């Protein structure tokens, strides 16, 4: 990240829903690095009760994330919220309204579906309750949060060079099948959610986009491969020399093009500070393409490009490009009711 971007979000108010770990934590810290006040929400808290804590065995908390945000140069505010409970979200938004009277950035990153995803099983053989819970956690929560937060995003007059923004965090920048029916529904749904919200917000000056990381080097991934952020590269290179070792903890070759959670965080900052970001509303973007457009890097100074790697290793796949979006707009509702929203 260039020095010019430091404090570029000073006095901005952000809400990162699902900031405990992974992409959410990386985004929250990057927003703090840019000087923002960041509400860091989630269920995993030092104050968690046994019934409402997040996935057992995971050590990260929202308080820790908030501390990291403040250390990066912003102001981190931890708030324990279950985003599937409307009353919880309404209470949070009421607090932000009372304290700041507006919201500039909303990041919907609530997920928690790793333990619910049953790979290599067709939909009629998976645990239905797990699949429905995944939809509740990772789609319903996003809708609930956007519903209550939208009036605060709209409360700030849209100036010519400044737009409040909603970012939906997903997996993948295309409409290919993602290997599990419920996982697929979640990741495609939030892309569509960003688009649908953009149609209702665009004339009001609020931007709505979806954003995907590449191979995310999250805390859980580092733990799985028994490495740290400091050792992952050397260990990955060594393990990749072993072919078909059978060790499930051996890092795949894909791991060498992975990105830290701060990479997607810097993508969020780039979008939030772009005066022309309204031109992007309604679409899905990737960290690797935005890094080249906005000239930001990962923590190690690199610009990992998952798209190029995937095409080289697995073959070409079609992303959501201009041709793809030409089928989305204008739609029949736009043609019949041109003043709709």
What are the roles of these predicted feature ranges?
Residues 112-116, 124-134, 154-203, 212-229, ...:
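Catalytic loop of short-chain dehydrogenase/reductase
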Residues 146-147, 195:
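A short, exposed helix-loop element centered on a Lys and neighboring polar residues
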Residues 210, 227-339:
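C-terminal helical subdomain
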Residues 72-77, 95-108, 114, 127, ...:
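A glycine-rich helix->loop->beta "capping" turn
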Residues 57-63, 80-92, 128:
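The beta1-alpha1 cofactor-binding region of Rossmann-like NAD(H)/NADP(H)-dependent oxidoreductases
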Residues 67-85:
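Rossmann-fold cofactor-recognition segment
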Residues 6-48:
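Canonical Rossmann dinucleotide-binding motif of NAD(H)/NADP(H)-dependent dehydrogenases/reductases
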